[in-house]
Amino acid sequence: GAYIKSDNAADNNLAASTYKLPLTMLWYEKIANGEVSPTQEFEFTENMLEKEDEENPNQPIGAKYKVGDKIPLSNLLEAAALYSDNIAGHILFENLGGYSAFKHMATKYSEHQQSKDFFNENKLNPDYTMDLVRHLYETSGTYDDLKYWLTYAGPHMFLNYNNPHGYVQKVGNNEEIRNVIGYAPTLYPFSVCIYSQIGDKEGEKLIGDIGDICWAYFEQKYNNGDYEMYDSSLAESRMAIGSPQVALAYLPDLPVDQRSTLEHPHGKTNS
């Protein structure tokens, strides 16, 4: 399909929590390949502690577990994908050999060559993430549970600001940084990647407007017959998402705009 990118698509940007998308993909791939069980437990050690995230408070791993506890992989993946939990992310990449080792593993999702700071710092670039999201979308089965969590993470945020559950997205925010990578699970699939220092609420609304513009544009192309050569049966299989067990108890003091759980289709939680 068509690929439109900005002139700086190869430039690395501060990734914020978008790094958790390739991280969780690697683990779901390991599960699918039988290399690890979702019930396998990983120890929460002191070096995995993360400072409190003021923009994403009440992250469940720090609230439910203490240093020394062992946490099932499935809980860590739920926390990292649905809540963007920083401790979960740290535990997951440490158990791949550390952050740099994880980033080297994750290069397989793109044919683009990466610079040194890609591996040593929390940075990503649109050339990489567009390939990453395409792989996520086109791979049926392996990532269905991950697609589920990403569908219900922040339904009124970023690309989904005006269109709850429209995009399957992973967001990243830290101070003025507002990043998002995602795709539209439709009969006219397309992906969007934005790395910005656009600011807080006004930036998030602007990203939502961009999401709406892209959606309308590709919907119009579909209505005009521009997708006639695309196999719609492929789209239907790739639109599938899983139905994983909800393991983490939702926290009642979570801000309303972060209560993905209120629109959760299953509505059941286990403490």
Model-identified regions with their sequence ranges:
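N-terminal carbohydrate-binding/catalytic regions of secreted carbohydrate-active enzymes
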Residues: 1-4, 21
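Structured C-terminal helix/loop/strand segments within mature extracytoplasmic catalytic/sensor domains
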Residues: 3-4, 11-12, 100, 137-154, ...
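Active-site SXXK
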Residues: 13-42, 80, 192
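Structural recognition of the beta-strand scaffold that forms the well-ordered cores
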Residues: 16, 79, 91, 113-115, ...
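Short, well-structured active-site flanking segments
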Residues: 29-52, 142-147
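Active-site-adjacent helix/loop patches that line small-molecule binding or acyl-intermediate pockets
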Residues: 46-47, 56-144
